[in-house]
C-alpha cells in the first residue's frame, strides 16, 4: 500500500497554479499519509516541526482505539504530550459546550501543537477552536465516515441549528488504514453516504451556475466527481472493510475536503441533500427525533434529491418563469422552526438578495433553458449508479429509516431550503410553484 504525502490530483493542477476558471486554488493540507506507518510518520512530522508538548484531542472511544497509542508514540520520541479527552462515548456534539471546554483547556495549556484523533465531531471541534486561537492542528482520522478531514470549514451546531463556520484545514493528515478498517460498519456506511451525496450537490451547483451565473470550477468539480464514481462502483468491496477498501473511500473523502478548501466553501460537496440532513439535526435538537449519523442522513436524502433533480431538469425544454418573491412564512413552515425564526429569516433574506443580484442571468427563452438543462446533464447522468450504490450500502428509499416518517420527509423537501442560503433544486421548484405537486 502506498504512502501519499501528496495524493493524486485528478486535475493535474498544482496546488497554487492559476486555474482555467481564473482563480488561484490553494490546497491547504500539505501532507496526507494513508498508510500503515501513519503514526510513525506523525511522530517524524512532529520531530521535524520541533514539537515539545503536543496536545492530543480525542473522545472516550477514539482514546481507546488510537489516542493512547498516539500519546505513547509521541512520548517515546521524547515529547511530553498533553491529553484532552471528551468523556462522551455517545452524543458528543460540535456545539457551544464542546467548543468552550476545548478552548478553555488550550488557553490554559502550554501545548505547542494540537493533534485531533477521531472522526467528524472531534475534527470539527478542534478545527473550529484552533482557528479561534490562531493555532494549527494535525488530523489523525479513526474512521472513513465523513468528508471534512481536509476541509477548511467546520460543521457546527449552535443554538440547535447546524451552521457551516469558517475554520482551518489541518496542516497534515495521518491515517492508518488498518485502524480505519476496524471502525464500526455504520461509520463506513456513513462515509459512503456522505461521499455519494456529492452527486446531488454537483447538480445543484451546476443548476445555480446555469440559472444565476454562480461561479463554478470544472477542476474542483472533477476533484469531487472522480472519486465519487470510483466509490460508487466499488461499494461492495468497501463494505467488506478491508484496508484497501476503506483506503479508497477515505481518499475520496479527503479529496472532497480538498475541493471545499480550494474554493473556500462547501459548495462543491453540499447541496439540498445536506440541507435535509441539517434540517433533521435541527429536529433532533428539538426532541422531535433521535440524532443519527450525518453520512447516513445525507445518503438517505440523496435518494430524494436525485429524484427531484431529474423531475425538474429531465423534462422538456420549457423556459421557466422568474421565481416569485419569497413571501412571509406560512404557519406550517413556521411550525418546523419554532424558536429559530430569526435564523430562518436571515437565511431567506440572503437567498433573496442573491436571486435579485443575479436576475439578469435568468434564462428567458426555451433555448437558454435547454442550455441550463444540458449543463446539468453530465452531473445527472450518474444518478442511477449512485442510487444503486446507496441501496448496496443499505441506505434505503423507504420512509421510516432513521426515525423519519412520511410527514417529516414531506416537510423536509419543502422547507429544508430555509436552513442555508445556498440555491438548490428545492429553491427552483418552490420559485416555480411546483414544490407541492
Regions found by a protein language model. Name each.
Residues 131-230:
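A glycine/threonine-rich phosphate-anchoring loop and its flanking beta-alpha core
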Residues 60-66, 118-124, 145, 272:
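Gly/Ser/Thr-rich loops at beta-strand to alpha-helix junctions
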Residues 226-236, 242-311:
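A conserved active-site cap/scaffold subdomain adjacent to cofactor or substrate pockets
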Residues 24-26, 49, 106-109, 130, ...:
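Solvent-exposed alpha-helices and their adjacent loops that cap or buttress functional pockets
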Residues 2-113:
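ATP/NTP phosphate-donor binding region
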Residues 36, 49-63, 187-191, 405, ...:
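N-terminal low-complexity or amphipathic/hydrophobic leaders
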Residues 106-143:
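A short, small-residue-rich loop immediately preceding and capping a beta-strand
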Residues 2-19, 315-437:
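C-terminal charged capping/lid subdomain of soluble metabolic enzymes
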Amino acid at each position: 500500500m502506498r504512502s501519499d504525502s501528496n495524493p493524486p490530483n485528478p486535475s493535474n493542477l498544482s496546488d497554487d497554479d492559476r486555474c482555467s476558471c481564473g482563480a488561484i486554488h490553494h490546497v491547504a493540507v500539505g501532507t496526507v499519509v494513508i498508510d500503515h506507518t501513519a503514526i510513525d510518520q506523525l511522530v517524524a512530522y512532529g520531530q521535524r516541526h520541533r514539537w515539545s508538548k503536543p496536545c492530543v484531542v480525542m473522545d472516550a472511544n477514539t482514546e481507546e482505539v488510537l489516542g493512547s497509542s498516539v500519546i505513547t508514540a509521541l512520548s517515546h520520541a521524547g515529547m511530553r504530550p498533553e491529553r484532552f479527552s471528551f468523556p462522551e462515548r455517545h452524543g458528543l456534539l460540535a456545539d457551544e459546550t464542546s467548543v468552550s471546554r476545548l478552548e478553555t483547556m488550550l488557553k490554559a495549556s502550554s501545548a505547542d501543537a494540537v493533534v485531533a484523533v477521531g472522526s467528524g465531531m472531534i475534527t470539527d471541534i478542534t478545527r473550529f477552536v484552533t482557528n479561534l486561537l490562531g493555532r494549527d492542528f494535525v488530523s489523525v482520522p479513526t474512521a472513513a465516515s465523513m468528508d471534512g478531514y481536509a476541509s477548511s470549514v467546520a460543521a457546527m451546531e449552535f443554538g440547535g441549528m447546524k451552521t457551516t463556520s469558517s475554520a482551518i484545514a489541518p496542516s497534515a493528515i495521518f491515517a492508518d488504514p488498518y485502524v480505519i478498517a476496524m471502525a464500526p460498519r455504520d461509520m463506513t456506511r456513513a462515509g459512503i453516504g456522505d461521499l455519494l451525496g456529492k452527486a446531488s450537490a454537483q447538480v445543484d451547483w451546476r443548476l445555480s451556475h446555469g440559472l444565476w451565473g454562480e461561479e463554478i470550477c470544472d477542476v474542483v468539480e472533477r476533484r469531487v466527481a472522480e472519486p465519487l464514481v470510483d466509490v460508487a462502483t466499488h461499494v461492495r468491496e468497501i463494505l467488506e472493510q478491508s484496508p484497501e477498501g476503506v483506503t479508497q473511500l477515505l481518499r475520496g473523502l479527503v479529496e472532497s475536503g480538498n475541493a471545499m478548501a480550494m474554493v473556500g466553501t462547501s459548495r462543491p460537496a453540499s447541496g439540498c441533500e445536506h440541507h435535509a440532513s441539517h434540517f433533521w439535526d435541527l429536529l433532533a435538537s428539538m426532541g422531535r427525533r433521535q440524532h443519527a449519523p450525518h453520512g447516513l442522513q445525507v445518503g438517505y436524502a440523496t435518494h430524494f434529491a436525485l429524484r427531484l433533480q431529474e423531475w425538474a431538469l429531465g423534462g422538456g425544454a420549457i423556459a421557466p418563469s422568474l421565481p416569485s418573491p419569497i413571501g412571509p412564512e406560512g404557519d406550517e413552515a413556521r411550525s418546523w422552526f419554532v424558536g429559530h425564526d430569526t435564523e430562518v429569516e436571515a437565511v431567506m433574506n440572503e437567498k433573496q438578495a442573491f436571486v435579485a443580484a443575479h436576475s439578469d442571468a435568468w434564462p428567458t427563452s426555451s433555448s437558454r433553458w435547454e442550455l441550463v438543462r444540458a449543463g446539468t446533464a453530465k452531473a445527472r447522468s450518474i444518478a442511477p449508479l449512485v442510487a444503486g450504490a446507496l441501496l448496496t450500502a443499505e441506505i434505503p428509499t423507504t420512509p421510516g429509516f432513521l426515525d423519519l416518517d412520511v410527514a417529516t420527509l414531506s416537510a423536509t423537501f419543502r422547507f429544508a431550503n430555509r436552513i442555508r442560503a445556498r440555491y438548490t433544486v428545492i429553491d427552483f421548484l418552490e420559485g416555480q410553484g411546483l414544490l407541492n405537486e
